[in-house]
Curated annotation (Swiss-Prot):
Assembly and binders: Part of the signal recognition particle protein translocation system, which is composed of SRP and FtsY. SRP is a ribonucleoprotein composed of Ffh and a 4.5S RNA molecule.
Broad enzyme group: hydrolase
PANTHER family: SIGNAL RECOGNITION PARTICLE 54K PROTEIN SRP54, SIGNAL RECOGNITION PARTICLE SUBUNIT SRP54
InterPro entries to which the protein is assigned, alphabetical: AAA+_ATPase (IPR003593), P-loop_NTPase (IPR027417), Signal_recog_part_SRP54_M_sf (IPR036891), Signal_recog_particl_SRP54_hlx (IPR013822), Signal_recog_particle_SRP54_M (IPR004125), SRP (IPR004780), SRP54 (IPR022941), SRP54_GTPase_dom (IPR000897)
Recorded name of the encoding gene: ffh
Domain notes: Composed of three domains: the N-terminal N domain, which is responsible for interactions with the ribosome, the central G domain, which binds GTP, and the C-terminal M domain, which binds the RNA and the signal sequence of the RNC.
Compartment(s) of residence: Cytoplasm
HAMAP family on file: SRP54
Protein name as annotated: Signal recognition particle protein
Any single Pfam family the record assigns to this protein: SRP_SPB
Entry's Gene Ontology cellular component terms: signal recognition particle
GO MF annotation: an example: 7S RNA binding
Enzyme Commission number(s) of this protein: 3.6.5.4
C-alpha cells in the first residue's frame, strides 16, 4: 500500500545520510521534500502540518546537528514521530471482550469498503480464540448481501443467523439477540448495511441498531484505496455513531496509503486491524511500530514470522526438514513451498516485509512478483505424474512437451520451472549440511536480494 511513499522517503533518507554533517538549510529542504511526499500520498493536510512541525522541532536540536550521524538521527526522529502519529494505547487497540456474553460488535462503513469480508475475518479470528461466534447480516438492501455473509461464514464453519426474506433490520436484530441467548454465543457480529455515500437514513438506521444492540465495539471499516475521502468518511461516522475503532481494508492494494496515516489522527480512535485480500486469515492486529517500520523501509520481520507461522503446516514442515537432512528435495516439496508463498500473499507481499525492500522493488521486474506465476507453476507440476515429481531427472524432452500441453503452457515455461527447481534444490541441499549458527554468516539472506 505504501510503495510510492516508501520509495520517495527512501530517496530523501539516502540524501540525508550521504550528506554527512547537516546544516539547518539542508534539514529545511528535507522537511519540504517529506511534506511533498506525504501530500502525494493523500495524507490529510492537518496531519502533515503537525507531523512536520514535530519532526522539525526535534531535528533542529543541537544534539542532532552535532551528532556523529545526523542523517540517521533524523530518520530515527521521523520513525518515532510516525509511531506517535499511528499509535494508541495497547488497551485501546485490543478488542473489548470484557462484557457478559454475548458480546456484541457492530460493523459499519460504506458499501464496497470490505465490511462483510472484514466481519467474516474477525469472526474467524475470534473462533480461533475458542469463542463461539454468530454472524448476522443486517444488509437487506444490497442484492444477495445476506447470502454473501452466509457463504463466507459457511466456508470457515462459523454460524450465521438464518435468512428470513423480507425481514427488516431491526427485526433481524431482535431475532439475533434471542438466538444468541438461547444458543449461548460468546460473540455476535452485526454486519450493517452500507451505502455508496453517507446519508441521513443510513446513519439513523445504524444509530437505532446501536441503541438496541449496545455493542462493546463499533468498528468502522475504511477502504484504504479511497485516499482523502477516507478522512471525511471516518469523521462522519465517528461524529454520528461514536465509533470505538477502525479496520483498514485492502491494505495490499496499489493505494497511496494516506488513509492509514490520517484516520486515526483525525478521529482520535485506534486502528485495530489491517485487512488484506479475500482470504479470511488475512487480518492482522494493528501495530504502529511495525507499520511505521514498513513505511520507512525498515522491514517488518515480526509480522513476516507471524504470518509464516500461521500458514505453514508444522507436520509437513518437519517432513520436509527430515528429507532435507537426507539431501532430498523433489518437486512435491517445491510445490509445497510455492503454495506457502502464495498463502502469504506472494513474493511481493513477502518482500514488502523485509528491510530495504523499497530499493529491491525498484530494481526487479515487477511481473516476476505476480502471484499468477505461482499458479502457472502449480499447474505445470500438477500435470506431471507422481513418478516425475519424485524423480525430476527423468523428465526428458518428450515428457516436457506432454507436461506443457497438460498445463496449457509452453515447453519454455516448463524448462524455466525445472531450472528454478534445480537451483533451489542445490541451495536446500547446501543449507541442510550447515550448522544453523552459521546460516546468517553464509550469506543465505542474499537469496532474497
Amino acid at each position: 500500500m505504501f510503495k510510492t511513499l516508501t520509495q520517495n522517503l527512501t530517496k530523501i533518507f539516502d540524501k540525508l545520510v550521504s550528506s554527512g554533517i547537516l546544516t539547518e538549510a539542508q534539514i529545511d529542504a528535507a522537511m519540504r521534500d517529506i511534506r511533498v511526499a506525504l501530500l502525494e500520498s493523500d495524507v490529510a493536510l492537518p496531519v502533515i502540518k503537525d507531523f512536520i512541525a514535530e519532526v522539525k522541532q526535534k531535528a533542529l536540536g543541537q544534539e542532532v546537528i552535532k551528532s556523529v550521524s545526523p542523517g540517521q538521527m533524523i530518520i530515527k526522529i521521523i520513525h518515532e514521530e510516525m509511531i506517535n502519529l499511528l499509535a494508541s494505547s495497547k488497551s485501546e487497540t485490543k478488542l473489548n471482550l470484557n462484557s457478559k456474553p454475548p458480546v456484541n460488535f457492530l460493523m459499519v462503513g460504506l458499501q464496497g469498503s470490505g465490511k462483510t469480508t472484514a466481519s467474516s475475518k474477525l469472526a474467524l479470528r475470534l473462533r480461533n480464540q475458542n469463542k463461539k461466534v454468530l454472524l448476522v447480516s443486517l444488509d437487506t438492501y444490497r442484492p444477495a448481501a445476506q447470502e454473501q455473509l452466509a457463504i463466507l461464514a459457511n466456508s470457515v464453519q462459523i454460524n450465521s443467523l438464518p435468512i428470513v426474506q423480507g425481514e427488516k433490520p431491526l427485526d433481524i436484530v431482535k431475532r439475533a439477540i434471542a438466538e444468541a441467548k438461547i444458543s449461548a454465543y460468546d460473540v455476535v457480529i452485526y454486519d450493517t448495511a452500507g451505502r455508496t455515500q453517507i446519508d441521513k437514513a443510513m446513519m439513523e438506521e445504524a444509530l437505532a441498531i446501536k441503541k438496541i444492540v449496545e455493542p462493546t465495539e463499533t468498528l468502522l471499516v475504511i477502504d484504504s484505496m479511497t485516499g482523502q475521502d477516507a478522512v471525511v468518511t471516518a469523521s462522519s461516522f465517528n461524529e454520528k455513531l461514536a465509533i470505538s475503532g477502525l479496520i483498514l481494508s485492502r491494505i495490499d492494494g496499489d493505494s497511496k496509503g494516506g488513509a492509514a496515516l490520517s484516520v486515526k489522527y483525525i478521529t482520535k480512535k485506534p486502528i485495530k486491524f489491517l485487512s488484506s485480500g479475500e482470504n479470511l486469515i488475512d487480518l492482522e492486529e494493528f501495530d504502529a511500530e511495525r507499520l511505521a517500520s514498513r513505511i520507512l523501509d525498515m522491514g517488518d520481520i515480526i509480522s513476516f514470522v507471524e504470518k509464516a507461522a500461521s500458514i505453514v503446516d508444522r507436520e509437513e514442515a518437519e517432513k520436509t526438514a527430515a528429507k532435507l537432512k537426507k539431501g532430498k528435495f523433489d518437486l512435491n516439496d517445491y510445490l509445497q513451498q510455492m503454495r506457502s508463498i502464495k498463502k502469504m500473499g506472494g513474493f511481493g507481499s513477502i518482500l514488502s516485509m523485509l528491510p530495504g525492500s523499497g530499493k529491491i522493488m525498484d530494481q526487479i521486474d515487477q511481473s516476476k512478483l505476480n502471484s499468477k506465476i505461482i499458479e502457472h507453476q502449480e499447474a505445470i507440476i500438477l500435470s506431471m505424474t507422481p513418478k516425475e515429481r519424485k524423480n525430476p531427472d527423468i523428465i526428458n524432452a518428450s515428457r516436457r512437451k506432454r507436461i506443457a500441453v497438460g498445463a496449457g503452457t509452453t515447453v519454455q515455461k516448463v524448462n524455466i520451472l525445472l531450472k528454478q527447481y534445480k537451483q533451489i534444490s542445490e541451495i536446500m541441499k547446501k543449507v541442510s549440511k550447515m550448522n544453523p549458527k552459521n546460516l546468517l554468516r553464509s550469506g543465505i539472506g542474499k537469496l532474497f536480494s
